[in-house]
Amino acid sequence: MTVIFHIEGGLGKHIMATALLKVIKKHHPKDNIHVVCAYPDVFKHNTAADHVHQNGQHGAFYKQYIKGKESKTKIYFADPYTQSDFILEQKHLLSIWANQWGLKYEGETPQIYLTQSEIDYFKPFYQTDKPILAIQPNGGPQNQGFNYSWTRDIPEPVVLKVVEEFKSTHSIVHIK
């Protein structure tokens, strides 16, 4: 079976999607998984993805991977941010994302795979004995008046609680 996991959104959503890719792989362990996304480097070296394609640059994707094989193709493409459980803060976002497709989320966490040369390059910048916790509490387009979005940004009091909780055990990196 061909499995297509299509992600739209920003870098943070793509990083979060690496956890969902683990869920998809758990449900499709022997299937060929294609990730279609805006930030393909997030999925680089991720063994759960057999192929990674950048949005708008996947050419004859339909013809090559789907046409004539529709009955053996599963497509995961939906936005969890539009679900009532997310908007009303009823469940964890990854649980919502998995549940909308009937998949079971069991606490999988995001993971980025780095090569040894990438690790060696960045090592001097992050000399620490603690694990790194990268946090992107807000985002959106720069200088366009979208300074805060309740559907995207973590409220400052929550960010401060997270930082306070992890500052003694992790080196915290703020991603803008």
Located regions from the model:
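Catalytic machinery of carbohydrate-active enzymes
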Residues: M1-K176
